């Protein structure tokens, strides 16, 4: 579906924000992944785990603001700080343009986009009970959907990273 839209040129007309994700830059020998292909992989991963249409929209749009937030900072490399929050702000404009519903379904997509990195961030730091409680409180009834999205977003080929994610993410959340 999405691949055909891309090769036909229609994706540029329908969702130019996705096309902006395409490409890899290199600065001082450091590159970042091609976020367009990463996004397609996330959508495919999620489709295997859920038939929730609105969660699939969240997967499609979860990195939509990365081109606007991309910076190279020495010595850390590429960062996309705040892409989740800016992406969440972009969702209503995209939904209105595509004449998608702007009701609770859109609000769910906004919430998932804005929270999409939160569970993974817990893996990168010492997990405290209060951090887990905040995540659960903020996610509310959507915690299972959020975890499915985060699992789908784990496209790394690094097996050590995958094991770390699973050991933290699924031990009681």
Language-model features and meaning:
Residues 12-19, 24:
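Acidic catalytic cores of enzymes that act on phosphate-bearing nucleotides/polynucleotides
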Residues 5:
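Residue-level signal for inorganic ion chemistry
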Residues 26-27, 43:
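Short catalytic-site patches enriched in acidic/histidine residues
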Residues 9-13, 116:
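Core structural elements
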Residues 2:
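Active-site pocket-lining segments that scaffold enzyme catalytic pockets across diverse folds
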Residues 20-21, 35-173:
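C-terminal subdomains that position terminal phosphate/3'-OH groups for nucleotidyl transfer/ligation
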Residues 28-33:
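Glycine-rich tight-turn/loop motif centered on a GG-T
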């Amino acid at each position: 579906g999405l691949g055909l839209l891309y090769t036909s040129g229609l994706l540029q007309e329908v969702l130019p924000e996705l096309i902006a994700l395409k490409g890899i830059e290199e600065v001082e020998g450091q590159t970042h992944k091609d976020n367009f292909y990463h996004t397609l992989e996330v959508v495919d991963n999620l489709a295997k785990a859920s038939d929730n249409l609105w969660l699939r929209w969240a997967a499609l749009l979860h990195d939509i603001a990365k081109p606007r937030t991309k910076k190279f900072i020495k010595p850390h490399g590429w960062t996309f700080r705040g892409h989740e929050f800016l992406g969440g702000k972009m969702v209503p404009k995209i939904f209105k343009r595509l004449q998608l519903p702007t009701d609770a379904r859109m609000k769910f997509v906004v919430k998932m986009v804005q929270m999409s990195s939160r569970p993974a961030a817990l893996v990168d730091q010492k997990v405290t009970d209060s951090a887990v409680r905040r995540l659960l409180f903020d996610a509310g009834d959507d915690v299972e959907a959020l975890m499915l999205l985060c699992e789908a977003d784990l496209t790394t080929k690094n097996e050590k990273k995958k094991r770390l994610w699973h050991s933290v993410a699924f031990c009681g959340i």
